[in-house]
Amino acid sequence: KHQGFKQMITLEQAWQAVHLVPDPEIPVISVTDLGIVREIQIKGEVVHIALTPTYSGCPATQEIQRDVEKALLSAGASSVEMELRLSPAWTTDWINPEAKEKLKRYGMATPSKCASPAAEQVIRFVPTLKENLNCPLCNSNKTERISEFGSTACKALYRCLSCREPFEFFKPI
């Protein structure tokens, strides 16, 4: 819990402030685009925010918490309480459609649907895909996986056989 100057902030202002916080590992999308901001409530002078990390060991979680808190305090919150919600587990289905388009323009492929139904599930970082991935650069479906892990555990590295460019794939979780 962080205490700051006593100012009032509306729920709409809180959501707007948090929407401006970029994901530290994929800065072209915000933490709200990614779907990890699960809830914001204002109770008195305290902004309560619930975040669900992309996975429980995500190394960016603390940085995201700091950035979200800073954004809320800058927007006029006088106090912020953060909750990490690990259940239900985050799924790539929570990435909003606009963010998927931003990721494609950034050169990253996203799954069309979750690997398994949203419920209690085992998170697997090795993709078991039954679909051909389209290259986010040229849209060819002639692609191959180079590595099961990309720059982070939740991404895999692929290469397009048509344009020969490498790209990352956000694994279905």
Model-flagged regions — what are they?
Residues 4-173:
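Domain-level signature for proteins that mediate thiol-based redox and metal-cofactor handling
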